[in-house]
Amino acid sequence: MLASASPARRRLLQQAAIPHQVMVSGVDEETIHHFDPVRLVQHLAEAKAGVVHQQIKAALPVLGCDSVLEFDGTVFGKPATAVEASSRWQRMAGAWGFLHTGHCLLSVNGERLSETVTTRVLFAALSDSEIEAYVATGEPLLCAGGFALEGQGGLMVERLEGCFSNVIGLSLPLLRRWLLVINE
């Protein structure tokens, strides 16, 4: 069971041929912000998985995830407005950031696997008109950090160091290792 409203996470699981169902946890992410970025995404992933695990009475394994971009020590979730997205991109263009995704898998027998995966992202040096055109697509408003690697935002990324799928919202290599553990 995927405890996430993210279409990108669903697509990753579908493309990897991992059977799943979706149940959105309803965890209010906006009320939880008093942690550093790594602890924040881990806390939210665990909260999402825990809520859904309880709702389905532990009948299926539950995967919760949450992602943020850390840029210059600041946490960037989804930008609220086009103005905010544009302002962030002005800062991010030509610079490195860290995309953190917290993962939590709760098995039917109550075993908890929990880990945060971090991928370093180098954003392309962009002109004001490139930023304006990208923000006008609306895509930056849908994603943590204000970009979708699997969409037009992929054109705005120069280089990645770490897990590619993590930047989309879910580390498939981590999930594969975990599925091997819980299926032993």
UniProtKB/Swiss-Prot annotation:
GO biological process, one term: nucleotide metabolic process
Keyword Cytoplasm included in the entry's annotation: yes
Cofactor(s) of this protein: a divalent metal cation
Coiled-coil zones: none
Keyword entries, A-Z: Cytoplasm, Hydrolase, Nucleotide metabolism
Claim: Cytoplasm is one of the keywords in the record: yes
Gene3D superfamilies in alphabetical order: 3.90.950.10
Catalytic activity line of the entry: a ribonucleoside 5'-triphosphate + H2O = a ribonucleoside 5'-phosphate + diphosphate + H(+); a 2'-deoxyribonucleoside 5'-triphosphate + H2O = a 2'-deoxyribonucleoside 5'-phosphate + diphosphate + H(+)
Signal sequence bounds: none
Enzyme class: hydrolase
Residue numbers annotated as active site: 66
Molecular functions per Gene Ontology: nucleoside triphosphate diphosphatase activity
Entry's Gene Ontology cellular component terms: cytoplasm
Chief location category: cytoplasm
Record-linked Pfam families: Maf
Compartments, as annotated in UniProt: Cytoplasm
InterPro entries: ITPase-like_fam (IPR029001), Maf-like (IPR003697)
Enzyme Commission identifier(s): 3.6.1.9
Family listed: Belongs to the Maf family.
Described function: Nucleoside triphosphate pyrophosphatase. May have a dual role in cell division arrest and in preventing the incorporation of modified nucleotides into cellular nucleic acids.
Record's protein name: Nucleoside triphosphate pyrophosphatase
